[in-house]
Amino acid sequence: MTKKIELAQIQVLFLGIWRFLLHLRQRLVEDQINIRAGHLAYVTLLSLVPMVAVTMSMLSAFPVFKGIRGQIEAFVYENFLPAAGDTVQVYINEFVGNASKGTAVGIAALVVVAIMLISAIDKSLNNIWRTKEKRSVVVAFSMYWMVITLGPVLVGASLVATSYVVSLKLFEGDALSGVMPLFIERLPMLFSVAAFLLLYMVVPNQKVKFWHALLGAVVAALLFELGKKGFALYVTKFPSYEAIYGALATIPILFVWVYLSWMIVLLGAEITAAMPEYLDYESSSDINETNLDGQPLAAQDTPAAQPETTSAQSSQVLETTDELAATAPQSSTLDKP
């Protein structure tokens, strides 16, 4: 008896997962995340150099970050730009150096382009959440400016804190000697989960539950790590872009990776936004009343519907009886001799 109950619970669990995946697939088709990811990838490439320039300028404003700027750059390029990170780093640093020599108007233009990227991300995520209320211009600009100014500082502070913890003598013992390499190896994964979690909870202009955002963040971080390894393997083992484009191979490689990254980010957002919809639907309907395709079973006649049909038929019978009763005297009169 207990095994039957456990088997039924497992079946209900898998059926619920299957129904959620069907709902998620429908959402992905409706929202066209491939088109949104292409738009965000295009805006990202336009905003990449201005964003890096603004970020490095913010880090340079704090003396504590001057000594670890190279470490921050190496960490970002190695973990977020697989395979082509070294080449991209050389080009971006050169572009940033040229951009920093510009006038005040040019620097202001860089800030505007960087804000355009954050605005595009904001609009895409709020469209996924079906948000109807829009932020005011003042609130939106304040949020964008906070991301540009405080974002690099928080990233730098977290890396400084991590470097400090790793350098402590507390972790030099034999018991913890194997813990630190494992922690450092998992550090990019933890940063990815934290970044996605913050993105899914803060950017949408509505309340997002922590556990829903955490689920989307974990899935997105896992896919991001797998995507890095898979893309790096593809670029190194199948160098078709280098054979076709030669020295310009970095451009399409960077664009493809940015596009895949945004696909992963939007997929995590779709999972986070679909969870409350699915749970609300499940709370209002019985999971056993639908088939595996997510379609409701054929509705059967309910007792409540039968009285309506009976009353309708009764009214028709009464009308027919009245008509016959009205014509009956006439016919009887005509039949008299």
From Swiss-Prot:
UniProt membrane topology term: Multi-pass membrane protein
UniProt keyword annotations, A-Z: Cell inner membrane, Cell membrane, Membrane, Transmembrane, Transmembrane helix
Pfam families referenced in this protein's UniProt entry, alphabetically: Virul_fac_BrkB (PF03631)
Coiled-coil segments on the chain, per record: none
Keyword flag Aminoacyl-tRNA synthetase: no
Gene Ontology CC: plasma membrane
Feature: compositional bias, Polar residues: 307-319, 328-337
Cited InterPro entries: UPF0761_bac (IPR023679), Virul_fac_BrkB (IPR017039)
Sequence segments annotated as region (Disordered): 291-337
Ranges that cross the membrane: 4-24, 45-65, 102-122, 137-157, 183-203, 213-233, 247-267
Subcellular location: Cell inner membrane
Entry similarity comment: Belongs to the UPF0761 family.
PANTHER family noted in UniProt: INNER MEMBRANE PROTEIN YHJD, UPF0761 MEMBRANE PROTEIN YIHY
Name the record gives this protein: UPF0761 membrane protein Shewmr7_3708
Source species of the chain: Shewanella sp. (strain MR-7)
Source organism phylogeny: Bacteria, Pseudomonadati, Pseudomonadota, Gammaproteobacteria, Alteromonadales
